[in-house]
Amino acid sequence: MKNFILLAVSSILLVDLFPTHCGHNVDLSKAINLNGVNFNNVDASSLGAAHVGQSASRGRGLGENPDDEEGDAKKKKDGKKAEPKNPRENKLKQPGDRADGQPAGDRADGQPAGDRADGQPAGDRAAGQPAGDRADGQPAGDRADGQPAGDRADGQPAGDRADGQPAGDRAAGQPAGDRAAGQPAGDRADGQPAGDRAAGQPAGDRADGQPAGDRAAGQPAGDRADGQPAGDRAAGQPAGDRAAGQPAGDRAAGQPAGDRAAGQPAGNGAGGQAAGGNAGGGQGQNNEGANAPNEKSVKEYLDKVRATVGTEWTPCSVTCGVGVRVRRRVNAANKKPEDLTLNDLETDVCTMDKCAGIFNVVSNSLGLVILLVLALFN
C-alpha cells in the first residue's frame, strides 16, 4: 500500500512536468476566461422563446376570469343567454356642456361655433362679413374702401409711400430710398456700385488701381515688404518670423517643422527618427514603449544568431520574461552575415510567459527526487 501511494504521487509529479501545450499545467486564468466566454455566448433567444411559449400555453389573455367561462358554458347548456355584468358602451360619450345635436357647446342651435350671431361662421362681427371689426364688404378691417391693406393711400399696395412707388420714403421712380437719382444704393457717387470710395474703384479707402486699401501700390496684402505675399517676414519669404528660404519659422534651416533637430520630420526626436519623439537612435516607437531593447542586448543577441538571421523574425532571446527579436531590413536581405550591423536590422520587444513556470518545474523535480529517495531507502 505504501509503495502504491508513492507511485501515485510520483506519477502526478511527472504529469505536472509535461509541457503546457500537451494539455497539462493549464493556466487557471485562461480556463476562467474560457468559461466566461462560454457563459456569455449563451443564446438568450431560447429563454425568450420558452417564456413566450409558457405564456401562450395559458390559453387566455390578461383580465379574463375563468369562472365566467365556466358559468357561460353552464348557461349555454341550459339554453339561456347570459347577460354581461357590466355592459360595454359601443359609442363614445359626447362632449358635455352643449345642446342636443350640437358639435360644440356654449353656442346657439344649428351654429358650428358659439358666441356669434345666427347664420354667421364666426362671432363678434357684422352680418354677412367673414371677419369682425371691419367695414361692410371689406376683407380686412381698419383700411380704406377697396384697399387690401389699411393705413395707405388709394391704389397703393403698401402705405406711407408716394403714389406709384413700391416702397415708401424714397424718391419717385427709385427702388430704394435715401439715395441719388438713378443709383441702386445710396450714399455713393454717381455711377459707382458702392459708396465712400474713389471713382472707378471696387472698394473704398485704398489707392487708385489697388484691390485692397492700406497697402503699398501693387501689393495684394498690406503690412508687408514690396513683392511679398505676407507681411512681417524677410523679402522673398512666404511666411514671417523665420530665416530666409525657410517655409516655417522657429526651426533650423531646411526643416519642415519647428522646435526639432535638423533633418527631422517630427519634433523632440533624435536625429534619423521619423516617428515617436524621445526615441533612441534608429528606433521608432515600438510595441513595448518603456521596455525598448537597449543597444547592448541587441548586439549580444545578434552575435548569437548572426548566421541564421533573415528577413523573418528570429525567436525571442529569452524563454521567459521580456526579450528581443530581430530581422533583416529589405535593403540588407543579400548582405553577408559577418557584415551585418545594427542599422541593417529591425528590432522588436517580445514578451514570453512569466518565469514562474520554471520555478514550478524545479520544485516538482525536487519533490520527485525526494519521493524516489524515500521509496528506495524505506
UniProtKB/Swiss-Prot annotation:
Residues 266-284 have a biased composition (Gly residues). The N-terminus is involved in the initial binding to heparan sulfate proteoglycans (HSPGs) on the surface of host hepatocytes. The N-terminus masks the TSP type-1 (TSR) domain which maintains the sporozoites in a migratory state, enabling them to complete their journey to the salivary gland in the mosquito vector and then to the host liver. The unmasking of the TSP type-1 (TSR) domain when the sporozoite interacts with the host hepatocyte also protects sporozoites from host antibodies. The TSP type-1 (TSR) domain is required for sporozoite development and invasion. CSP has two conformational states, an adhesive conformation in which the TSP type-1 (TSR) domain is exposed and a nonadhesive conformation in which the TSR is masked by the N-terminus. TSR-exposed conformation occurs during sporozoite development in the oocyst in the mosquito vector and during host hepatocyte invasion. TSR-masked conformation occurs during sporozoite migration through the hemolymph to salivary glands in the mosquito vector and in the host dermis. Keywords: Cell membrane, Cytoplasm, Disulfide bond, Glycoprotein, GPI-anchor, Lipoprotein, Malaria, Membrane, Repeat, Signal, Sporozoite. Residues 72-100 have a biased composition (Basic and acidic residues). It is a lipid-anchor; GPI-anchor. Residues 80-88 are annotated as: Required for the binding to heparan sulfate proteoglycans (HSPGs) on the surface of host hepatocytes. Residues 356-378 form a propeptide. It is found in: Cell membrane; Cytoplasm. The keyword Lipoprotein applies. Gene3D superfamilies: Thrombospondin type-1 (TSP1) repeat. Glycans are attached at residue 319. Its main location: membrane. Pfam families: TSP_1. This is Circumsporozoite protein. Disulfide bonds join 316-350, 320-355. InterPro entries: Crcmsprzoite, TSP1_rpt, TSP1_rpt_sf.
